């Protein structure tokens, strides 16, 4: 009996900014992000194209500070558009939802800088306006100057404590979304002159270590109540947080083997929380360059590399690492560094190529397209082969697609790769369900988002 093929699920990963993960592509004639990112038609057309390709969701990342670690300044980040300038991702969602019927919209929102009472209202509003197609990518944030700009001082709260606070933050939002309003609170009773039954709208009276929120929630129940919940933390504490709350996990795993280990770790953590192993859907990031032939795709990738801004790539890398490497010689071996601050990123580099010494120049070269994402370059058949290999050998559920150029990279994938995956019975050809949770998951409101 032939084993049923696992379906490949896709999210488009980008930011309301310029050349999200491939620094310098604003110079590439096929990239439209430099002018388009601030235009609503740009986002509406992208959403419609992704829906044509049966993507689960368009995922919009966000940051609230600048990458100012490299050379102790934000200058390189500003010069090379390292996630700067960056617009608010929540505001384009309503327009994109109006122009589409099925695709979901996920956006990053920080538990460090926004109060849970405000967050609950925002996502309920978006869930209403999208008719249940919104998701929240939960982050605790990591850029120090954002902390200063929000008036929280020049030192970030300690990493694990940020997650402790985020756990409590989630409890507040669950109570507001799930328990403040009864399902039949809206009565619209003309005879009694009553629109909403006040006996069915409740305070939550939450008192915790970080938050005291009496309630009630300001919004009537939305189609999903709780939005679909995504998370991207890869630390031990981040995995524990995801195992408690996330329905989807985004990750940057450089190799099939590292992805396999991460998938196992996430699924094991979910089981420890009393959840099924497949309750969380896991989406590694991947950068795809596709053309009609392998040779044409390689040529396209090489041309894209010619537009790269190495200093921009290093500003991004140092921001992630939290340590300034600019004073090193460009040929010094980073792997020999003993500092704890960068070990996670160095481990990722070793996984990519254990025989490489990984100088700053090597890092800049590798990050030229797709930053640290694994790269798949080739014809539709070659790309589909590799995506199938990742799915079958790692037990991941799909991918976060990170283009080199935008929107052309997404357009190429929808036009060339999606039909190949559909021909192989690896991708759906239409949507079922109405809400994002119903389309993408097996539950309407999962037990893990209900804290009864």
Regions found by a protein language model. Give the residues of each.
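Hydrophobic faces of well-ordered beta-strands that scaffold small-molecule active sites
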Residues: 10-12, 58-60, 105-107, 134-138, ...
